[in-house]
């Protein structure tokens, strides 16, 4: 509201959103409120905000507040991979962790549903989101570390920003359905209630452990172990300790998780008890993997 009240913004012909996810989502609100066209210029590849018709807003303590649904997505997204390559590597790293959630979360949310055209397209496209991250992720991080806008970095940036963003647009509406996110993000939404975790670790970093939790809950152990090995290879978390959560924190995370929209998006009924156990079991699998390396 403060930005939208500025005279230079009111008098502008269009809104340019330059920066990361929170800057972009702020501009979505401004563009919607002032009925101005929005163009996005992501300076990092840490999420799909530059492409989506959804905004995520947070409280001052970094805990999740609510979603905002503009009437349309940004008109165009401009990606300069050299800018991405010169951004902090840890943001690309966290972006990989966040994007790893798209395929498994959409699949879980849409399983058993008779989907109409648009969300069916989203589910089909979600299947394209994981493999590029696993195939190119490690090399992309190396290129980012060297500030090189190579092909691997481009493939990963496009996956994080564009592929997952298009899936989000196809699987999310303000009122009809929300198949965009599930248990992996439930771990993230609970983590800020544990200051050591929520304040010290990036969104995608925590979500990447949430992916292992979701796949454990879903008993998809083969896929979990594949992504666990990938996480370990690039330094993404595979244990609770790596995101500063302890056994005593799990119920707090689960209690918060059960209150968010993502908990209710699947035809499957989730329980807090099983969710806590899935976090424990994912942690045990991660510890075992690391011990054997």
Regions found by a protein language model. Give the residues of each.
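N-terminal small/polar loop signature for handling phosphorylated ligands or for N-terminal nucleophile
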Residues: 1-39, 139-153
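Short glycine/serine/threonine-rich phosphate/pyrophosphate-binding segments
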Residues: 22-28, 48-51, 180
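A glycine/threonine-rich phosphate-anchoring loop and its flanking beta-alpha core
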Residues: 32-126
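A short secondary-structure junction motif
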Residues: 103, 107-111, 140, 163, ...
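C-terminal charged capping/lid subdomain of soluble metabolic enzymes
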Residues: 112, 220-293
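Active-site segments that bind and position negatively charged phosphate/pyrophosphate groups
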Residues: 116-230
């Amino acid at each position: 509201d403060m930005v939208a009240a500025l005279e230079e913004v009111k008098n502008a012909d269009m809104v340019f959103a330059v920066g990361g996810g929170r800057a972009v989502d702020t501009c979505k609100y401004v563009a919607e409120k002032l009925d101005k066209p929005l163009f996005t210029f992501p300076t990092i590849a840490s999420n799909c905000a530059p492409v989506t018709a959804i905004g995520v807003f947070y409280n001052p303590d970094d805990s999740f507040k609510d979603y905002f649904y503009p009437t349309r997505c940004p008109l165009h997204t401009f990606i300069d991979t050299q800018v991405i390559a010169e951004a902090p590597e840890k943001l690309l790293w966290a972006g990989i962790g966040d994007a790893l959630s798209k395929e498994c979360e959409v699949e879980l949310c849409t399983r058993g549903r008779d989907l109409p055209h648009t969300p069916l397209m989203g589910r089909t496209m979600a299947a394209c989101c994981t493999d590029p991250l696993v195939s190119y992720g490690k090399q992309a991080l190396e290129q980012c570390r060297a500030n090189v806008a190579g092909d691997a970095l481009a493939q990963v940036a496009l996956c994080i920003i564009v592929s997952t963003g298009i899936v989000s647009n196809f699987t999310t509406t303000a009122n009809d359905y929300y198949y965009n996110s599930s248990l992996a993000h439930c771990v993230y939404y609970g983590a800020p209630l544990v200051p050591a975790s929520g304040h010290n670790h990036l969104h995608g970093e925590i979500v990447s452990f949430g992916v292992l939790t979701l796949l454990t809950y879903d008993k998809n152990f083969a896929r979990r172990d594949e992504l666990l090995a990938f996480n370990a290879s690039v330094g993404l978390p595979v244990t609770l300790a790596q995101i500063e959560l302890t056994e005593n924190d799990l119920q707090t995370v689960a209690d918060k998780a059960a209150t968010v929209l993502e908990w209710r998006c699947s035809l499957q009924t989730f329980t807090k008890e099983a969710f806590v156990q899935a976090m424990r079991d994912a942690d045990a699998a991660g510890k075992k993997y690391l011990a054997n390396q």
